[in-house]
């Protein structure tokens, strides 16, 4: 089916204290695994391509077009989202390629500049019917240091959403990007306070470092969109290593990447249950 915008899924998830799953795509096997899991469970899944993935491939279009083809061949409702972009030219390219959601991350800028830049991006995207996510506060780990960043203030977040018109907000509540161990301790009280203060869905970045039970609790407290990348890369890599250990003579990447893709599919299906995904 065609790509969908996240608006309906975000609204349903927020209204019923359920999650919307968002998983990062680095290579085609990721997208195929996510689509397979979405079809098997009937859930909506957000397929995310990050600015870092674009740097790895050297361009956005080849991977984006491949993901669009996967989505159009799928029977599941899939969202194509640009993740953590601070490059406005990249955001515009994503809009031209048919992305149905974009994240513009100006959180490193002073507050007033963050507001102004984000509002401009939101206006441009909304004119095309595309959803916009932004970030306020500082989620740890962007620089490789797994320390929690500056927590998001509910009052400032309310002001920010009103001033920018964004559709969802990534908030800093104790998680950290790129964690390989699931030891993050989330501030559930702050999540609840942000949920009560804001009219837009909350987004949790750095969810790979959060234990299952805490992810479930975070969704119940008011977190909506749950971003997971590193944890699924871990699943893929572990499966590839295990396959090659058992089949040391194999050199065909379809063999070992197929094992990795299957492992990611299985883990995604499990995670969809953990967050009670819509």
What are the residue ranges of the model-derived segments?
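Generic enzyme active-site microenvironment
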Residues: 22, 81, 133-135, 203, ...
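Alpha/beta enzyme core
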Residues: 6-16, 28-53, 60-75, 85-197, ...
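Short secondary-structure transition/capping motifs
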Residues: 23, 52-56, 79-80, 260
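Glycine-rich beta-to-alpha transition loops that act as phosphate-gripper elements at the mouths
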Residues: 24-25, 80-86, 200-212
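C-terminal alpha-helical cap/extension of soluble enzyme domains
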Residues: 211-278
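Basic/polar N-terminal segments that are highly enriched at the extreme N-terminus
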Residues: 1-4
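Glycine-rich beta-strand-to-loop/alpha-helix junction loops that act as flexible
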Residues: 174, 205-208, 228
